[in-house]
From Swiss-Prot:
InterPro entries: FAD-bd, FAD-dep_Monooxygenase_BioMet, FAD/NAD-bd_sf, HpxO. The gene is hpxO. It is an enzyme of class 1 (oxidoreductase). Belongs to the FAD-dependent urate hydroxylase family. Its EC number is 1.14.13.113. Catalyzes the hydroxylation of urate to 5-hydroxyisourate (HIU). Is likely to be involved in the urate degradation pathway to allantoin. Prefers NADH over NADPH as the electron donor. It catalyses: urate + NADH + O2 + H(+) = 5-hydroxyisourate + NAD(+) + H2O. FAD binds at G11, E30, R31, S43, M125, D287, G297, Q298, G299, G300, C301. This is FAD-dependent urate hydroxylase. It comes from Mycolicibacterium vanbaalenii (strain DSM 7251 / JCM 13017 / BCRC 16820 / KCTC 9966 / NRRL B-24157 / PYR-1) (Mycobacterium vanbaalenii). One of its GO terms (biological process) is purine nucleobase metabolic process. Keywords: FAD, Flavoprotein, Monooxygenase, NAD, Oxidoreductase, Purine metabolism. Monomer. Coiled coil: none annotated. Substrate binds at N180, R206, Y218, F219, F220.
């Protein structure tokens, strides 16, 4: 059996490794010519880490991951700690430490595990279809190349061409209402403790820092802005100083420290969940299937879960492509949709879609001992192929 995977992002590479583990011939095509992911880092929660471990990357993942011992919320205006709590109850409940990881390093780890020389870079897919006999699927690339395979997996991102084919037309993404500015800086106690995930909140905005490897923080600023607001590259400090004027010194230090030319600006969008992921021998995976906001940190993790579910589906149905893809779709659509909607709900609370609701959340944070926050995070983590719901995780 030959499976073509279009897209060498986290989902595509995880799927390629997972299918190769069970002896399936995989070929990966990627439109870019070098490893330049959008976003500086990613929070890989325990369900995602378990997927990476399953793919044989336990040591590499732990080496790249930041060690988060505690989590805190801080009043952005006063600098007062609203709550601080240990992450160890979460680790004990789900059986795995989460790891924030620099995105380019995670991507490179996956590519190396699969074999960088086995990835076909610079190949932009412009069309995908099943053949008229239903015996193969075909992808067409911008250079005129066509490839046929028993299965084509479209891991071609949020603007997926594969999704258009599977659904029979384009689907509009929804602007979530905010812009995320993100990057990497050296750890600095003036910004936050080196082993803590620190989040400053206020006025429907947030600033967050978390440790990644090599004594660095991954940081992001969330700002409510109209979609398409003008922005001049390299002027991020001026923009953030205006948005966060009067905020606590830790935030000002972060703004002063960041590299304006290495800071990403991302308008955040998502997709309404849909439950048709397969058309004949063509299927979607990752952001192509469930583009989500980053508000619960599950987008990449969900893509990795897709990869494991895809492997299991082909394990169960090694000689029946259609049964395997149907099993994959059945295993994933409800779970992925739930994560999209959980993220959307958290997004609205965090970014003051209803200011009264957000104000109540700030009050709750001031009375939080970590129990409720950890319960919510565990609720996001469980439900995937390697993190089934158990009596322990339900508690």
């Amino acid at each position: 059996m030959k499976v073509v995977i279009v897209g060498a992002g986290m989902g595509g590479m995880s799927a390629a490794i997972a299918l190769r583990q069970i002896g399936i011939d995989t070929v990966v095509y990627e439109r870019v010519t070098e490893n330049k992911p959008v976003g500086a880092a990613i929070s890989v929660w325990s369900n995602g880490v378990k997927c990476l471990n399953y793919l044989g990357l336990q040591e590499e993942t732990a080496e790249l991951g930041g060690k988060v011992e505690t989590m805190s919320y801080v009043d952005g205006h006063t600098g007062d700690t609203m709550c601080r709590f240990s992450m160890h109850p979460l680790i004990e409940q789900v059986g795995q430490r989460p790891y924030p990881i620099a995105r380019a390093e995670l991507q490179l780890m996956l590519m190396k595990a699969y074999g960088i020389d086995d990835i076909n870079f610079g190949m932009k897919m412009v069309g995908v279809e099943n053949d008229t006999a239903g015996s193969a699927a075909k992808a067409t690339f911008a250079d005129g190349t066509t490839v046929s395979a028993d299965v084509i997996i479209g891991a071609d991102g949020a603007g997926s061409i594969t999704r258009e084919y599977v659904l029979g037309g384009p689907v509009s993404r929804r602007y979530a209402g905010y812009v995320n500015y993100n990057g990497l800086v050296s750890t600095d106690d003036a910004i936050g403790p080196a082993t803590e995930w620190t989040t400053y909140v206020g006025d429907g905005k947030r600033v967050s820092v978390m440790p990644v490897s090599d004594d660095r923080f991954y940081f992001f600023f969330d700002v409510v802005e109209p979609q398409g607001s003008p922005y001049e590259e390299g002027r991020v400090r001026e923009v953030l100083r205006a948005h966060f004027a009067g905020w606590t010194p830790g935030v000002q230090t972060l703004i002063d420290t960041l590299d304006p030319l290495a800071t990403n600006r991302v308008e955040i969008l998502d997709l309404d969940p849909f439950h048709t992921w397969v058309k004949g021998r063509v299927a979607v995976l990752g952001d192509a299937a469930h583009n989500t906001t980053p508000d619960i940190g599950q987008g990449g993790c969900s893509a990795m879960e897709d990869a494991i579910a895809l492997q299991w589906a082909f394990k169960d149905h090694p000689d029946d492509v259609h049964a395997a893809l149907a099993a994959y779709q059945s295993a994933r659509t409800e779970r992925a949709a739930d994560l999209v909607l959980r993220a959307r709900k958290r997004c609205d609370v965090t970014h003051a879609k209803d200011p009264q609701v957000t104000s109540r959340w700030y009050d709750e944070l001031r009375n939080e001992d970590g129990t409720n926050i950890i319960r919510g995070i565990v609720g996001n983590i469980v439900g995937g192929p390697l993190t089934p719901v158990t009596a322990a995780t339900e508690g």
